[in-house]
Amino acid sequence: MWRGIVCGLLAGAFWGAVFIVPVLLPDFSPLELMVGRYICYGVLAAALMLPRLLPLLRRLRRDDCLAMLRQALSGNVVYYLLLAYGVKLAGVAATSLIIGLLPLSVTIFGRKDHGALPLRRLALPLLVVAMGIACINLDIFSHAGGAGTDGASLAQKLLGVLCAVCALACWTWYALDNARFLKCHAQVSAVEWAMLYGLASGVIALIVGAVVLALQQAGAADAVPTRSWSQFWLVCLLLALGASVVGNYLWNLASRLVPVTLSGQLILSETLFALLYGFLYAQRMPRPLEWGAMVLLAAGVLWSVHAHAREESAGGEELA
């Protein structure tokens, strides 16, 4: 089990890096970052699947292709675009803490699929989470600056928080849709499917990138600042390789080696690493309200996971 825990923590370390990239490349818009990341991911996915790509594509039906496109949009393209805007406007800490609610949001909205606890049994964990969200919002709007905010105005910070919430909703929907799809389509493995919608994400990013490039060339009369495109593509390639390929592979290993209830807790490592990277970049310690938000949100999510673990254990004893 310890091997699985290490794999889960390493996956979180790779995934946490996605939150710091908008801060590392401030001269590039979230749209450009999304395009760069998923073009690189699409190329890597195609290269990794090359020997079996054509046979796999022939097995896909029209419904499979539609599912692949909608999951590429919800789980990759739109999700990361919203995340990057959240980081730019509200900062790394706020965005990572809000998206760190994923284990709880997937549990709540997927309760009919998994026979999870009724909401009334989750009232106290949800209250703790709400207190954590209140803390991080109080911190955002009472302090100027921070990793990723670039002196954002009140309206921009509000928009950043909204983007983070929408990113959370987007990935929650994707996670549930993906799980339901894989249960009903055993002919495609989880790894093959991840690579397929990675390839679809690359195609979408390529189309969006072509449109953005055409618009930029049409407005070429405006002065465009010199930007380090070599650094941009290097970071995007490392992000695609680390977060999208290696991170996902490590998480698949962890999922096989640890109990399901523990995997929900390991997802929090993504948030913790994102916070660590953000505070290291800003060269500061968390403020009191940020400490409070981290403790409350982690406690709320872990409380919920523990409640479900007890319910599963009780159900298993009854069946025995």
Q: What does each of the following model-derived ranges do?
A:
Residues 45, 49, 118-143, 147-148, ...:
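Hydrophobic transmembrane alpha-helices of multi-pass small-molecule transport proteins
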Residues 48-52, 102-127, 134, 272-291:
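C-terminal transmembrane-helix exit sites in multi-pass transporters
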Residues 12, 36, 76, 80, ...:
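Helix-helix packing/entry segments at the starts of transmembrane helices
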